């Protein structure tokens, strides 16, 4: 995976993310990725190498970006192109190529959430 040490996103990484994520990755959004900001899923910190890479980026509108940064929404990207959101009310959403799936706020949602983090067995 291509990674750079700067906050600015090189064109080759931008193209890779836009091809992977054709739409904004906020739950239930239908906005084209081409017109959105590319947001660092894990916020960028000066001096930490390799943070700007496709597996740490996703297209978000400014409004969704502000919701993530200041509005209580939590975001994780356990695999490139798979986005897990937690709303301020505790609801879980999984966003990927096939759209948004509401996973609720109960024990089952936690099981589904954790399933994306499991590594496949070797073999």
In which residue ranges do the predicted regions lie?
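Short helix-coil boundary/hinge micro-motifs
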Residues: 1-123
């Amino acid at each position: 995976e291509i990674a750079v040490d700067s906050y600015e996103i090189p064109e080759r990484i931008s193209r890779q993310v836009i091809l992977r994520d054709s739409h904004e990755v906020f739950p239930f959004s239908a906005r084209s990725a081409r017109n959105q900001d590319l947001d660092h899923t894990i916020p960028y910190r000066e001096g930490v190498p390799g943070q700007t890479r496709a597996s740490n980026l996703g297209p978000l509108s400014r409004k969704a970006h502000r919701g993530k940064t200041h509005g209580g929404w939590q975001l994780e990207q356990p695999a490139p192109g798979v986005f897990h959101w937690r709303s301020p009310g505790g609801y879980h959403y999984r966003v990927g190529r096939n759209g948004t799936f509401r996973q609720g706020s109960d024990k089952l949602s936690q099981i589904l959430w954790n399933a994306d983090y499991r590594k496949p067995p070797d073999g």
